Amino acid sequence: MDSKDQTMFYNFGDDSIEEDVKKLMKQVYVALEEKGYNPVNQIVGYLLSGDPAYIPRHKDARSMIRRLERDEIIEELVKAYLKNNEIGEK
C-alpha cells in the first residue's frame, strides 16, 4: 500500500497551551473590536493565510498572535468547538 493512502497521526502532546490560546484570543478579539473590525473574519483570515496583516498592531495584538503557531491555535479552537457541542470525548 502506498504510504500516501495511510492515515497519519498528528499530536502536539502539550495540553498546557490551552490557557495561552484562550488568553491570547480574548486579547486579540478585544483589539479587533476596538478598531472596528469583525474579529471572527480577521482571525479566520490570519489562520488560513498566515498573513499577520489581518491582525492590527493595536494593543500589540499582531505580535501577540504570532507568539503561538497557527496550528496550535487551530487545534485549541477545534477542541473547544467539539467540547461545547458535546462531540467526541467527554
UniProtKB/Swiss-Prot annotation:
Stretches that traverse the bilayer: none
Pfam families listed in its UniProt record: IreB (PF06135)
Top-level taxon: Bacteria
InterPro entries in the record: IreB (IPR009309)
Similarity annotation: Belongs to the UPF0297 family.
Name of this chain's protein: UPF0297 protein lmo1503
Species of origin: Listeria monocytogenes serovar 1/2a (strain ATCC BAA-679 / EGD-e)
